[in-house]
Amino acid sequence: MKIDIVSVFPEYFEVMNLSLMGKAQAKGLLEIKAHNLRDWTHDVHHSVDDTPVGGGAGMVMKPEVWSECLDELLGFSQPSAATDAVDTSDPGDSAAPDSSAPSGAPVLIFPNPSAPLFTQRDATELSHADHLLFGCGRYEGYDARIPDYYRAQGVDVREYSIGDYVLNGGEVAVSVMLEAITRLMPGFMGNPDSIVEESYTGEGALLEHRQYTKPAVWRGIAVPDVLLSGDHGKVDRFRRDEALARTAEIRPDLIAALDCKALDKADRKTLMALGWEVSAAHPRRLAD
């Protein structure tokens, strides 16, 4: 997978040379390059921002600088003749022309706190892409016409939020998304089975059960006896029940999204004991 990152602080991404990300690059699984947006400026101050049209606080990143940068990285030889045919859909819309399995052409991704939430499903989908191009905003963000323009040129443009909070820039958000995406690539993890039971993974996703290691008793706190029983069936059931219970407490929305037909008898019993009705298409809390 080829990954290009555009930022006014490209040195931020030197951390990508560490740990599994660095090993994946050494093995040829990833090719990561961070670009300095200021390299596409032409004034003595290397300006990348200007005051907001209509007034207001802060500065907005200029479309002229971004367009020169993105045109080059996307392989556009010159501005498209479709310049005037700009898609004016909600810039927070992250839908792609074909969101089933991106590959081949680059996927252009902008972090944006006003956009849809980035999820494990998005990470899984994007892990199949051949080329990801991330744009890191700063200040009050980037001119809204930038993603609109490239959508109109047929580019698969995504805008994602990583949570209900605001950061100083897009670099942290890009790092989060990049790690979530790349670790799902075949060959990235040393043990591919380690991602199978993780939180949010697969259909009917739940929060993962809690984990323990040796010693069996630490500072007077013992691990659950069933985990020491050697009975793999009981261990699996215990972990499944704990995953259901933790999800019901912390993320009840994930329980409510489950397909009751896919639940086995033990799952149903556990959820009923936790106060959920499981006779309909999806579980429903009895207190609701």
Swiss-Prot record:
CDD domains in the cross-refs: TrmD-like
GO annotation, cellular component aspect: cytosol
Example of a GO biological process term: tRNA N1-guanine methylation
Catalytic reaction equation(s): guanosine(37) in tRNA + S-adenosyl-L-methionine = N(1)-methylguanosine(37) in tRNA + S-adenosyl-L-homocysteine + H(+)
The protein's enzyme class: transferase
Transmembrane segments: none
Bias type Low complexity, positions: 89-105
Gene3D superfamilies registered for this protein in UniProt: 3.40.1280.10, tRNA(m1g37)methyltransferase, domain 2
A Pfam short name: tRNA_m1G_MT
Molecular function via GO: tRNA (guanine(37)-N1)-methyltransferase activity
Record's keyword terms, sorted: Cytoplasm, Methyltransferase, S-adenosyl-L-methionine, Transferase, tRNA processing
EC number: 2.1.1.228
Residue sites binding S-adenosyl-L-methionine per the record: G137, I162, G163, D164, Y165, V166, L167
Record's subcellular location: Cytoplasm
InterPro entries: Alpha/beta_knot_MTases, tRNA_m1G_MeTrfase_C_sf, tRNA_m1G_MeTrfase_TrmD, tRNA_m1G_MTases_N, tRNA_MeTrfase_TRMD/TRM10
Covalent S-S links between cysteines: none
Disordered: region residues: 82-105
HAMAP family noted in UniProt: TrmD
Job of this protein: Specifically methylates guanosine-37 in various tRNAs.
Similarity comment: family membership: Belongs to the RNA methyltransferase TrmD family.
Subunit structure: Homodimer.
UniProt protein name: tRNA (guanine-N(1)-)-methyltransferase
Originating species: Bifidobacterium longum (strain DJO10A)
